[in-house]
Structures are given as structure tokens and as C-alpha cells.
């Protein structure tokens, strides 16, 4: 077995040792150690952190430098003053055992209590048999009757944070990868956590990927996410071998936000964000009695020869993104992990869905009963699962914890959601489950703009590739200030249905004004023709004949109100709740007030899909006319927020889809009435993704 030379003390003078087959655990006065024939780690007792990770003799971390050269380790934004990195003075344990398959395992346990509040963070890492990775679980508890409500759990994450020059590339998904930037700390800061490095022309990141670097460029949506990490191309390894360091989503049940959640995954650090408010995600409150465990996830390390590519090592890691993988092992260690449910309390949830005609990429979600899965942070026992529905309508989700859930089904090209509460998932269920989804309808659809896909990516600067760089990342990933709105739309948005092109003639963000704050390319805000979008369309006399009601539906993929990312308390100011107004031919007007708890940074943080909600405006069809009709969609002029960091102060929404329908043979509604379409306990937020009109 290879013994690390740099930290050989960790493996010398062992006070205790346990070995079965090829796995060895040991302890001395300064370190705990886990090792097999290829892979070894050492945890320093002085700080409670892993300080050495080696694969086949190659140091994967580098020297300790502050919190760099460590990991994986746990930290949080959870104490009254902000961030806390537990470990120093923590309770530490070395765990040994053999699982039900006869395979040896070793584990490291760290638990630390913040004395001022009595909140505890705990972390487990397990090494099993000949595997070259660590199984990770994290736990947070808060018990304090004196202060029953402490604050929000703003962030909880584990980090593999190397200091070595070994790692040369990042990989967030199959389609998004590139060389690590060399000089991101020495460029021009253009907004919070965003740097211009385009003048560093010899930086491979600049020449191949982008002139701007922000960790938000390297975020991913959870729906189809399997693995992310760092790659070494062999240019700096000891023998020319290639290496990978990966975080594998082998389970997703203890994350929040369902398949629409997105988060940071890698920059120079391989993250596992268990909780965050990024992209407007809600976070749980730490109240007396809070007790939750996250995991398992798998930190995996692999090696190839000099010809092995990033894609090869990534594909190897992705094989483990399977909730059924290592189930026997997780059952065997369940007694070590509070709140974790072994296989005896799990079952397979399977069945068939009758889908609306035209449904594409349908998905079924199991989540907290009675709650929008995007807001499933209130119950510490909340779990979530999802699966793609195949062409026959069939689905199967393995290893679901028995309980009562909400079912949510949605699909591209279909407006709305199918929602059913109080669905019991039990081992005793002998028959497959069956659901029938009928698309929401209000008359005959007259037009539709965009794709109902829960994102604003089809519009200008969305999913389209940035062809100015060889790796061609999606445009929305790049710093928003690169795209000058006045240059793109000098006359504002004037979209005519049937003639205009959504990919060119609608922006991925609807601004209240175009900001200069956080925009190094513009010294003054721009206000002309920004907050009002005009959509025109033609109607014939036949289309209007014998109709009473028109319905305008808008679905949005995110919104920023003056509340910013603050979720549960409205900030002082005019636009904590953001009004978005529709005017029809100057004859009808109605306002949708987007509530503060749906607010979040989305587009300015390189995203096109965040909190999703929708709205229906119903009005008498007599407000429409034969020939040209005009909708004006308005945010308040100059609506802004107060920013404590260098961030844009303009408020905005991002539309997914819009559409219009005409409905015959119904009485006309009250012209001042509109309806919010949400789910669970509320329904607000805004970032456009698709809109339609029905008449």
C-alpha cells in the first residue's frame, strides 16, 4: 500500500489499526487514516479536516493553505455572524466495519457544536473496499428553547478544495467544460463574484471559453445532473497520467427544490451544495428541534493514462449516479447515520401516466405533500424524487422512502402542471400507480410565443452558443453585461406574432431599466423603451365571432423584486412585491403582483431557469378587435432595489412562454379579475419563458 511521503506522520506510529482484505484504518496522535491499495486519505485531528488525498501515489490536494489543500470538508452560513467551518475542537471518531456483502469499510466522523447557539454540524465520510472515493453524509441540528428561531440555514456544503496545480480543467456537464482560468483573482471585478480577464490573452480559459469568469457560469440544473468535477490532463501529474475528482449525484432525495433547482457545482473547488439561496432558491429556517441529514453523495477519484480524455473519466464517474448502487452498503452503515432510512423502509414507485397530446420530455416528481416542490424547505423530513416518463407513459423510481407525497407532472410544449396530493407510497401497494393529465384549456389557442419548458433559454442570449470562443458555451452562462440591451433593441421590444423571431426579437430578461451598476461597459443606466414590451398580433372576424372571453397566459422562469434573495421577510421599499401589468389595446388593464418570497437573482447570475410560476389574465373578448391588436407588458419604470454588493439594481423578470386563447359561450369575467396559477401555498415569481393567448 502506498504511504504518502508528504504527510508520512499520518501513517506512522499508529496507536490503533484495523484491516480487512485490502482496506486499512489507522490512528495516531495527529491523524486518522483510511486507505486501500490505491486510495488513501488522512484527517488532521488539529482541525478536523481531511488534509491528504492520494490516488496511485499522486497527491490530489496539495499543501494546506488556509482552507485550501483540504477536503472534502463541511461548512455553512448558519451562525449569527455568518459562515462557520467546523472542525477545530470537534468530536472525531474512526469507524470500522464489514458490510452485508463481506466488504470492509472505514469511516471518519466529525461533529462540532457552536457553543453560543447549541447548533451542531456533523459529517461522515466512508471508504468501502477497493473503491477510490468517499461516501458523504452531513447533518445539522438546532436545539435551543431560549432562542427558538435562530436564522435561516443560508448555505450548507461540502468542498473538495485543492491547492495543487495538478487540476487543469473543469467539467459541469457533458456539454460544458473548459480549462481552469489562470488569473481570475487578478482581473477587473465587474460585479460581485465576476471578473473580466479578457486582457490575459495567454490564459487558455480566455482563448477557449470566455473573457469573463464567475462561478455562476459553472452552475447546473439538477434535473439530469449526474456528476461534476475537476480534470487533470496529465501535464502536471507526476507520471503524465490523467486524473479526475468528481462529485456524483447518486441520490437526490435530500436536496431541495426538485428537478428545477440549479446551483454552483465547480470552479477551482468541487462543491456539493446541500443548501443555498442561489438563483432564488428558498432555504430552511433554523428553529428549535431542527434535525436533518443530507446524503449520500459520492466523491469519486479516478485515473487514466496520457491518452484518456476528460469525457472518458467523466463517463466513468457517471456510472455511479444510480440510487440503487451500493444499497447493501448503505443499509449496513444505516445505524451510524441518524435519519437515514434503510431498504426495509423503501420501495419502488412505478406506474403509467396518460399524457396530453404533444407532451415532450415529460417528468414525474415525488415531493413533500401539499407543497410546491420548489419550496420544499419547511419540513425537516421533506424528501424528493423524480424520473423521466418514457414514450409509453411509464415511469419507475427506485428506493423511495415510504410515505405520503405530492405528485407533480410537467412536460415541454404543455402549459401548466399535473398535481395530485396525498399519494401514499407503500411497499404493500401491489398495483402500479396510474395518473391521467389533461392539459389546461380555455378555448381555442390563437397564438403562442416561446416553448413551455420552464426556462427563458429560447430567447436572445439564452441557450444559443457563444460562437466567439471555440468551446462555445451557452450565452446565458456568460456575464449579462456583455450583452448591451440598447444595442440589441434600440427601439425596445416590438414583437409581432407570426413574423418576429423569438430567438432574436425577445430578450431573455425583461428589465425595468438597463443598469449601469455592476456593468463595466456602461457608465449610465439606460431607460428608453426598456420597461414596456409590446406584443402585436392579428385577428380575423371569424376568430372573434361568437366569443365572450379572452385569456392571456404567461409563465415565467424567474423574477427579481426589490427583496433580492431575501425570502421570508419583506424588505422596506416600494417594490418588494413587483407589479407586472398587461394593457390590451388601451381598453383593458390588469396587474399581476409578484410576491417577495419568489424573488431571486437569476439572469444576472447566469441562469435562465429559476423559480417557475404562471398567471392567467381573463378579460372580455370585446377588448380585442379585427385586424391588429396590441398588448403592452410593463414593469414599473426605473424599478430598482438597494444592493449591498456590486450587483445590478434593476428589477426584472424572465418569461418562459406566453399565449392567448379565445373562449366562446361563456359569460365575460369581471374585467379587473385575473388569476394566479401557482401550486401549493402560493404562486408568485417572474422570469419569462413562454406566453400564449387564448381566445
From Swiss-Prot:
Glycosites: 28, 96, 118, 144, 199, 285, 532, 638
Subcellular location: Secreted
Keyword presence, Secreted: yes
InterPro entries assigned to the protein according to its UniProt record, in alphabetical order: Carb-bd-like_fold (IPR013784), Gal_mutarotase_sf_dom (IPR011013), Galactose-bd-like_sf (IPR008979), GH-type_carb-bd (IPR014718), Polysacch_Lyase_4 (IPR051850), RG-lyase_II (IPR029413), RG-lyase_III (IPR029411)
Alphabetized Gene3D superfamilies for the sequence: 2.70.98.10, Carboxypeptidase-like, regulatory domain, Galactose-binding domain-like
GO molecular function per UniProt: carbohydrate binding; rhamnogalacturonan endolyase activity
UniProt-listed Enzyme Commission number(s): 4.2.2.23
Keywords: Carbohydrate metabolism, Cell wall biogenesis/degradation, Glycoprotein, Lyase, Polysaccharide degradation, Secreted, Signal
Pfam family membership, one: CBM-like
Biological process, per Gene Ontology: cell wall organization; polysaccharide catabolic process
Record's GO cellular component terms: extracellular region
Record's signal peptide: 1-21
EC top class, as a word: lyase
Catalytic activity: Endotype eliminative cleavage of L-alpha-rhamnopyranosyl-(1->4)-alpha-D-galactopyranosyluronic acid bonds of rhamnogalacturonan I domains in ramified hairy regions of pectin leaving L-rhamnopyranose at the reducing end and 4-deoxy-4,5-unsaturated D-galactopyranosyluronic acid at the non-reducing end
Classification via CDD domains: RGL4_M, RGL4_N
Record family assignment: Belongs to the polysaccharide lyase 4 family.
Function: Pectinolytic enzymes consist of four classes of enzymes: pectin lyase, polygalacturonase, pectin methylesterase and rhamnogalacturonase. Degrades the rhamnogalacturonan I (RG-I) backbone of pectin.
Name under which the protein is recorded: Probable rhamnogalacturonate lyase C
Organism: Aspergillus oryzae (strain ATCC 42149 / RIB 40)
Chain's gene name: rglC
Amino acid at each position: 500500500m502506498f504511504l504518502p511521503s508528504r504527510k508520512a506522520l499520518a501513517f506512522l506510529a499508529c496507536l490503533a489499526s484495523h484491516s480487512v482484505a485490502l482496506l486499512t484504518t489507522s490512528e495516531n496522535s495527529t491523524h486518522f487514516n483510511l486507505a486501500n491499495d490505491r486510495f488513501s486519505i488522512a484527517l488532521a485531528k488539529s482541525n478536523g479536516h481531511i488534509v491528504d488525498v492520494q490516488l496511485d501515489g499522486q497527491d490530489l490536494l496539495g499543501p494546506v493553505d488556509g482552507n485550501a489543500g483540504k477536503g472534502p470538508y463541511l461548512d455553512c452560513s448558519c451562525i449569527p455572524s455568518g459562515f462557520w467551518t467546523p472542525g477545530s475542537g470537534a468530536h472525531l471518531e474512526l469507524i470500522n466495519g464489514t458490510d452485508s456483502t463481506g466488504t470492509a469499510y472505514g469511516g471518519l466522523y466529525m461533529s462540532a457544536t457552536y457553543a453560543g447557539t447549541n447548533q451542531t454540524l456533523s459529517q461522515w465520510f466512508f471508504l468501502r473496499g477497493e473503491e477510490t472515493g468517499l461516501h458523504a453524509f452531513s447533518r445539522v441540528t438546532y436545539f435551543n428553547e431560549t432562542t427558538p428561531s435562530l436564522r435561516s440555514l443560508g448555505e450548507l456544503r461540502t468542498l473538495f478544495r485543492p491547492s495543487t496545480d495538478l487540476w487543469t480543467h473543469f467539467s459541469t456537464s457533458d456539454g460544458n467544460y473548459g480549462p481552469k482560468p489562470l488569473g481570475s483573482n487578478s482581473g477587473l471585478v465587474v460585479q460581485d463574484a465576476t471578473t473580466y480577464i479578457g486582457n490575459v490573452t495567454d490564459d487558455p480559459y480566455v482563448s477557449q471559453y470566455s473573457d469573463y469568469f464567475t462561478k455562476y457560469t459553472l452552475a447546473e440544473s439538477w434535473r439530469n445532473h449526474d456528476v461534476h468535477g475537476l480534470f487533470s490532463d496529465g501535464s502536471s501529474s507526476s507520471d503524465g497520467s490523467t486524473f479526475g475528482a468528481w462529485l456524483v449525484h447518486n441520490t437526490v432525495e435530500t436536496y431541495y427544490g426538485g428537478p428545477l433547482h440549479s446551483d454552483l457545482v465547480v470552479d477551482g473547488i468541487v462543491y456539493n451544495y446541500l443548501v443555498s439561496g442561489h438563483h432564488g432558491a428558498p432555504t430552511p429556517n433554523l428553529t428549535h428541534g431542527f434535525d436533518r441529514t443530507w446524503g449520500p453523495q459520492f466523491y469519486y477519484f479516478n485515473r487514466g493514462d496520457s491518452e484518456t480524455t476528460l469525457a472518458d473519466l467523466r463517463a466513468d464517474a457517471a456510472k455511479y449516479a444510480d440510487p440503487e448502487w451500493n444499497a447493501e452498503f448503505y443499509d449496513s452503515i444505516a445505524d451510524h447515520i441518524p435519519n437515514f432510512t434503510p431498504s426495509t423502509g423503501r420501495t419502488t414507485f412505478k406506474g403509467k401516466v396518460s399524457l396530453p397530446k404533444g407532451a415532450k420530455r415529460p417528468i414525474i416528481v415525488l415531493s413533500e405533500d401539499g407543497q410546491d416542490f420548489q419550496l420544499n424547505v419547511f419540513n425537516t423530513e421533506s424528501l424528493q424524487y423524480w424520473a423521466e416518463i418514457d414514450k409509453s407513459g411509464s415511469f419507475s423510481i427506485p428506493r423511495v422512502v415510504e410515505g405520503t407525497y405530492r405528485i407533480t407532472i410537467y412536460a415541454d410544449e404543455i402549459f401548466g402542471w399535473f398535481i395530485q396530493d396525498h399519494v401514499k407510497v407503500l411497499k404493500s401497494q401491489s398495483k402500479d400507480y396510474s395518473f391521467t393529465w389533461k392539459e389546461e384549456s380555455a378555448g381555442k389557442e390563437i397564438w403562442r410565443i416561446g416553448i413551455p419548458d420552464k426556462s427563458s433559454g429560447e430567447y436572445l442570449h439564452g441557450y444559443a452558443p457563444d460562437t466567439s470562443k471555440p468551446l462555445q458555451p451557452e450565452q446565458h452562462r456568460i456575464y449579462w453585461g456583455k450583452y448591451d440591451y440598447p444595442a440589441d433593441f434600440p427601439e425596445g421590444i416590438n414583437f409581432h406574432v407570426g413574423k418576429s423571431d423569438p430567438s432574436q426579437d425577445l430578450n431573455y430578461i425583461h428589465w425595468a431599466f438597463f443598469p449601469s451598476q455592476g456593468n463595466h461597459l456602461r457608465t449610465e443606466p439606460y431607460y428608453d423603451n426598456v420597461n414596456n414590451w409590446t406584443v402585436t398580433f392579428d385577428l380575423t372576424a371569424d376568430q372573434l365571432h361568437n366569443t365572450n372571453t379572452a385569456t392571456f397566459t404567461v409563465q415565467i422562469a424567474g423574477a427579481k423584486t426589490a427583496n433580492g434573495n431575501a425570502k421570508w421577510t419583506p424588505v422596506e421599499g416600494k417594490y418588494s412585491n413587483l407589479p407586472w401589468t398587461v394593457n390590451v389595446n388601451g381598453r383593458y388593464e390588469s396587474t399581476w403582483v409578484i410576491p417577495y418570497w419568489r424573488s431571486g437573482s437569476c439572469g444576472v447570475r447566469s441562469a435562465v431557469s429559476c423559480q417557475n410560476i404562471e398567471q392567467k389574465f381573463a378579460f372580455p373578448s370585446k377588448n380585442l378587435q379585427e385586424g391588429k391588436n396590441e398588448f403592452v407588458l410593463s414593469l414599473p419604470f426605473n424599478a430598482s432595489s438597494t444592493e449591498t454588493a456590486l450587483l445590478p439594481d434593476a428589477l426584472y423578470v424572465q418569461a418562459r412562454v406566453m399565449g392567448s386563447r379565445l373562449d366562446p359561450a361563456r359569460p365575460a369575467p369581471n374585467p379587473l379579475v385575473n388569476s394566479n396559477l401557482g401550486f401549493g401555498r402560493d404562486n408568485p415569481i417572474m422570469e419569462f419563458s413562454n406566453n400564449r393567448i387564448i381566445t
